[in-house]
């Protein structure tokens, strides 16, 4: 049993009022989940306890005031039993607010007080620890108030644990969706790409960047401290920079076509995990906000939530130290509304938004996002999924059309179902055709198109969409410095399942070819141009899926496709294991392949060579590369003005190469271990660097050996082939 007794101590001539927490184990958690080995044979949670918590959570949700919530908690028999032998004055210090009292009693009601408020023998920091844990509990209680606060959070976790063993017997049909194949460049798709460019000023971008990246084991090389996914360097840029540069490339394309500079507002949902929020702020400051106005970004932080073990208990890292993890990206909508993100975007005339995740760096390749958003804009859709083929039996969610019949007719919902729920919904993961390795259901990629008003209207109906739990073995550090591994879960949620509330109703059943009548939509594209994630560290001999190495091979597959099929280059054959050459480019070079093919035409790249084009304005034809070539402009898209804002088109560097041969020793073989990071050691390299608005021209020349050509601003340099070599 818990009680707080008052002790007065004097320290450094100051008097402190200390509230010491004591526990007895006679009132313990009555809400226990059995181990998974037991749950496979019997229900994992006592039904009576589930019903009690469900009713308590519902009552807490419906309460109209904090006083009413407190009355509900005081009436709970677990709370009553807890206070049978002590008064409220003994249990709670006067400094605890009524909200804090409700939070503590909520923890008592769910049976976790004996863990959350446990005090180590001889502890001296009790009051500070209590204050800290109360702050966390209050944040959880407030954020999840729409589902019953702390009680609703805990009930959701254990009820999901129990329901994961049940079969959903609703009379619903799950139908493969019919979407627009944007890989087929027919007139409809080309028109929508054009719309995606022309109407970019109507669009905002929202990024979920709070990923913990536990499985990547990302650490600061100097301090050893863990780092969030946004800090991972991939193909020469951090994952956060990749997302921002992608949108800048589309803005730059709009500028080149229409002569108008746009600044797309970007909202970033961060998290508290691994100091993610502060890391994102630091990264933005280091990059000087990527040459964008500081006010064009809106950072909002998702709450961390208590982790729960297989026994249904909250996990602790020390005395009154909860193990906290991000609560899933499904909170993005409620959090965005609560923090004013929607209002901020609407004030800027943005009614639609593109949503992306931090761990998928290839989504901006070519014209996929422009076609996707173009369809959503031209057809005024309220929600969209950018989808692609999915391997049968892969651990990925699927996009489905859910059909349900009732007395009013037929209802349809284009949505997502996570792979861990297939059994629950009796979904069979079958191939699209006999012998195919691809599923009949396409992959959910978490690339979304949203109508802000429609989403805002549905948040109250579904504040935490797609609730789920997923147990994972997780290592964490205890306060004594030790490393502990537990199989844990927390209440997660999925942002894409806000679509569950976007239902279309018809009097008659619809044929698949009529699904275009939905207010939602789906596109198909090639998988390697849609999604390839970086979620975990590669283990030698293990699968490449979801590793940086695997993602880079998809990145290289796209580069191979671009050069061979669009730019008409002769390149080495594609290797499924290791890149046979390296090619990286700034997205502003296109980003459309059709535009890049106008700037880079006909040539040859020899095996093991590396071509890096960190420039937008180039004219390359007949290049023969055997070794390493890097062309970099200080001003890729323009010049930064006195306010630190990038002005598109002002003083960009330019380069023209016609029938140029580059020969050098190229990449050092021992530098290819972490090739996916994009930083190589070169035995020799030909590097052309253009300061500010500098220009470099070369025609019918051979650039041999290691060369460093720096062209000063305001200067045009021409390379000329002579008998004794090249002169400039």
Residues of each region from the PLM?
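Positively charged N-terminal leader segments that act as targeting/secretion signals
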Residues: 12-22
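Domain-scale recognition of functional cores that engage charged ligands
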Residues: 170-207, 215-496
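Short, low-complexity, intrinsically disordered N-terminal modules
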Residues: 6-7, 20, 29
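Left-handed beta-helix
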Residues: 23-26, 31-199, 374-728
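Intrinsic disorder
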Residues: 2-4
